[in-house]
């Protein structure tokens, strides 16, 4: 969440920055916030006055007792003050709770260099790498190319319905090879520590990284035998959730930072609001695999860390020889918790366009504040860390890109040279 002191200092300025995000979207009830803040300040001021009065009366009671005076009236006043303070504390707790809940629905503030715009049309292309291949035969899409290789949507539909996949044989081997290759790049070349995390997490964990409470409809939640008394749990939509929350409620030493973590995991998304979009193939699935990168840094390190993380994702695409472009997302297209986001889009020949394959974001202290994760700075004070996350890469979409960019006229697939050791030296995939 954003720092509430920013809202208290200049609410209008914060609202102006938030208005650059996707509109129309009521992020904050400004009038309710002002009313609660006014009541909070009044309560805190009166509480301080009452506490001072009670201290004064306590001293007076001591003097009266020493002189044998009547303390009953003073004791009655002290008792009344105690009752008033108790009621005030209860109301203050209610106000703080309502303010906290309001903040949970407010997105992060975009950095100053983020392009301002309502949607993806305002995204800024930063660079391109590689040139799309020119084919001398009719290009086939990954569904047609993958079917003889074991990409089986008929079986997955029988098992689970739409937006699932069943891979076997060469397709499954390629999928496994890609994930292992991605992990090797990030751990062996870029210094990430490989992790294996739970795929089911508690509600407060999703609140920490910002999926809840705002985006519950995008999640799959878990019922333990229909027992609704059990703690609320969800399937992860990305291992960013579990990796980032691994440092929740901790105070880290400055020399521990940056922390760099990676994991290969399935991701589960309901795709609410995506009806009719990308219904064919692997592009948009309820369950897909991804290699995730997470960094925990100091505030001074995070801007450079984002640029390096983008490079870590680019390295995978370059080693695979896949053409791509890098976009700086606009204020209207970036995610809820992000202060700045780059998307990597890979060339998909059958669609003759670039499609997202990685998203790398600097969340600054937004998630850390929700998770209560701090580090001890050079002055010995506890300060919120910055968190970053990025895909390195989405495995299914990378499989799509390899099939389509490396296809041959006879339907076989040339194996990218970098993947051959992961596939027992195979040069081609064919039925």
UniProtKB/Swiss-Prot annotation:
Pfam families with a match to the protein in the record: Seryl_tRNA_N (PF02403), tRNA-synt_2b (PF00587)
Keywords tagged on the record: Aminoacyl-tRNA synthetase, ATP-binding, Cytoplasm, Ligase, Nucleotide-binding, Protein biosynthesis
The enzyme's E.C. designation: 6.1.1.11
Binding site for ATP: 269-271, 356-359
The keyword Cell membrane belongs to this UniProt entry's keyword annotation: no
Pathway membership, UniProt: Aminoacyl-tRNA biosynthesis; selenocysteinyl-tRNA(Sec) biosynthesis; L-seryl-tRNA(Sec) from L-serine and tRNA(Sec): step 1/1
Subcellular location, record wording: Cytoplasm
Recorded GO MF terms: ATP binding; serine-tRNA ligase activity
Domain of life of the organism encoding this protein: Bacteria
Catalytic activity: tRNA(Ser) + L-serine + ATP = L-seryl-tRNA(Ser) + AMP + diphosphate + H(+); tRNA(Sec) + L-serine + ATP = L-seryl-tRNA(Sec) + AMP + diphosphate + H(+)
Secreted listed as a keyword: no
SUPFAM superfamilies, alphabetized: Class II aaRS and biotin synthetases, tRNA-binding arm
Entry GO terms, CC: cytoplasm
Sites where the protein binds L-serine: 238-240, 292, 391
Any single biological process term in GO: seryl-tRNA aminoacylation
Top EC class for this record: ligase
Domain notes: Consists of two distinct domains, a catalytic core and a N-terminal extension that is involved in tRNA binding.
Subunit comment: Homodimer. The tRNA molecule binds across the dimer.
Function in brief: Catalyzes the attachment of serine to tRNA(Ser). Is also able to aminoacylate tRNA(Sec) with serine, to form the misacylated tRNA L-seryl-tRNA(Sec), which will be further converted into selenocysteinyl-tRNA(Sec).
Family to which this protein belongs: Belongs to the class-II aminoacyl-tRNA synthetase family. Type-1 seryl-tRNA synthetase subfamily.
Protein name (record): Serine--tRNA ligase
Organism: Leptothrix cholodnii (strain ATCC 51168 / LMG 8142 / SP-6)
Highest classification ranks of the organism: Bacteria, Pseudomonadati, Pseudomonadota, Betaproteobacteria, Burkholderiales
């Amino acid at each position: 969440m954003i720092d509430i002191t920013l809202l208290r200092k200049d609410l209008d300025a914060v609202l102006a920055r938030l208005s650059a995000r996707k509109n129309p979207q009521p992020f904050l009830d400004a009038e309710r916030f002002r009313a609660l803040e006014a009541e909070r300040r009044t309560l805190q001021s009166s509480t301080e006055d009452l506490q001072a009065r009670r201290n004064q009366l306590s001293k007076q009671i001591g003097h009266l007792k020493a002189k044998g005076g009547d303390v009953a009236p003073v004791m009655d006043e002290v008792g009344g003050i105690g009752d008033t303070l108790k009621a005030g504390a209860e109301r203050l707790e209610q106000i703080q709770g309502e303010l906290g809940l309001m903040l949970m629905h407010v997105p992060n503030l975009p950095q100053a260099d983020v392009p301002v715009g309502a949607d993806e049309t305002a995204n800024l292309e930063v660079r391109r790498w590689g040139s799309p291949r020119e084919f001398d035969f009719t290009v086939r899409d990954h569904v047609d190319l993958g079917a003889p290789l074991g990409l089986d949507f008929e079986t997955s539909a029988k098992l689970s319905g739409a937006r699932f996949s069943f891979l076997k044989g060469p397709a499954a081997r390629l999928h496994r090879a890609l994930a292992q290759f991605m992990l090797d790049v990030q751990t062996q070349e870029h210094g990430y520590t490989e992790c294996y995390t739970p795929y089911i997490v508690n509600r407060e964990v999703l609140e920490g990284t910002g999926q809840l409470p705002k985006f519950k409809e995008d999640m799959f939640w878990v019922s333990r035998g229909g027992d609704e008394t059990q703690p609320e749990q969800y399937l992860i939509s990305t291992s960013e959730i579990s990796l980032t929350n691994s440092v929740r409620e901790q105070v880290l030493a400055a020399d521990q930072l940056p922390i760099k973590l990676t994991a290969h995991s399935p991701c589960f998304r309901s795709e609410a609001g995506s009806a009719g979009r990308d219904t064919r193939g692997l592009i948009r699935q309820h369950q897909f695999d991804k290699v995730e990168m997470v960094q925990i840094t100091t505030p001074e390190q995070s801007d450079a860390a984002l640029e390096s993380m983008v490079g870590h994702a680019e390295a995978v695409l370059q080693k695979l020889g896949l053409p791509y472009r890098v976009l700086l997302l606009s204020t209207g297209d970036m995610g809820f918790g992000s202060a700045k986001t780059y998307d990597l889009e890979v060339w998909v020949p059958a669609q003759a366009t670039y499609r997202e394959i990685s998203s790398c974001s600097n969340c600054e202290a937004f998630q850390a504040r929700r998770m209560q994760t701090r580090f001890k700075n050079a002055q010995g004070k506890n300060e919120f860390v910055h968190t970053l996350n990025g895909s390195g890469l989405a495995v299914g979409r990378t499989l799509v890109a390899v099939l389509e960019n490396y296809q041959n006229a006879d339907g076989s697939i040339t194996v990218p040279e970098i993947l051959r050791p992961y596939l027992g030296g195979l040069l081609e995939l064919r039925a």
